[in-house]
UniProtKB/Swiss-Prot annotation:
This is 7-carboxy-7-deazaguanine synthase. The lineage of its organism: Bacteria, Bacillati, Bacillota, Bacilli, Bacillales. It is an enzyme of class 4 (lyase). [4Fe-4S] cluster binds at residues 33, 37, 40. S-adenosyl-L-methionine binds at residues 82, 126-128. Catalyzes the complex heterocyclic radical-mediated conversion of 6-carboxy-5,6,7,8-tetrahydropterin (CPH4) to 7-carboxy-7-deazaguanine (CDG), a step common to the biosynthetic pathways of all 7-deazapurine-containing compounds.
């Protein structure tokens, strides 16, 4: 059976972002991404800085480690990255998770399609705004969202500035029937000064709330902070 490149397995913790914010979950963080966002808070998944930490693991190995770490204290697993949608062989892992009664979630930027996405319970698609310096392939994104029709999906846009907010408005208008989340961006992913970081993030959150409540196009949007950053700062593995 083919192996999966894994950088981290951790939890139980709570999901800090998007449609399942606050959900108690275990995390599987895979290596590799087809993007290189300017402000990426998990650049170690693709920039080579953590290449010595990558483990090639079978789905059985991953499940065994989830249980070893989480015991009986979880029923939800989040697959994160990087971009886990780069990997073709996640379906075997999903089968094991389902056999053991797990609900599953994933976040991907909507740049790659895999048939196994249809097996995921909660799918967050997070297209990257202008501040990321990445370009959205809307034709590909259209196709992916169409294939996921009827699934429990959402769109999430991280917002750093006015240009990002304008991008978010256009995204929401393009897919008005897909639940939509605005989220504060963290542009200081290296600091260990948690008090300073929390103040910055809360100031940004207040700014984003003000933008949203004064924009009629965002009447149905939900505005979120980065919950995990407010609790743990930039700490990994939480």
């Amino acid at each position: 059976m083919s192996k999966i490149p894994v950088l981290e397995i951790f939890g139980p913790t709570i999901q800090g972002e998007g449609m399942v914010v606050g959900q108690k979950t275990m995390f599987i963080r895979t290596a590799g991404c087809d993007y290189s966002c300017a402000w990426c808070d998990s650049a170690f998944t693709w920039d080579g800085s953590a290449k010595d930490q990558i483990r090639q693991m079978t789905p059985e190995d991953i499940w065994d480690e989830l249980v070893a770490i989480g015991g009986e204290n979880f029923s939800h697993v989040t697959i994160s990255g990087g971009n886990p949608a780069l990997l073709k062989n996640i379906e075997f892992l999903l089968s094991i998770l389902k056999e053991n009664g797990m609900r599953t979630a994933i976040e991907t930027q909507g740049s790659k399609w895999q048939d196994w996405l249809l097996q995921i319970d909660e799918i967050t698609i997070s297209p990257k705004p202008p501040s990321s310096t990445m370009k959205t392939d809307f034709q590909r994104l259209d196709a992916i969202i169409q294939k996921l029709a009827g699934k429990d999906i959402s769109l999430k846009v991280v917002v750093f500035d006015d240009h990002d907010f304008e991008y978010a408005v256009k995204m929401h208008e393009r897919y008005p029937k897909v639940p939509f989340f605005l989220q504060v961006g963290n542009d200081d992913t290296k600091t260990v000064d948690d008090a300073m970081l929390i103040k910055k993030l809360l100031d940004k959150y207040e700014w984003l709330i003000d933008k949203a409540v004064n924009c009629k196009e965002m009447n149905d949007a939900k505005v979120l902070p980065q919950l995990h950053a407010l609790v743990w700062g930039n700490k990994r593995g939480v």
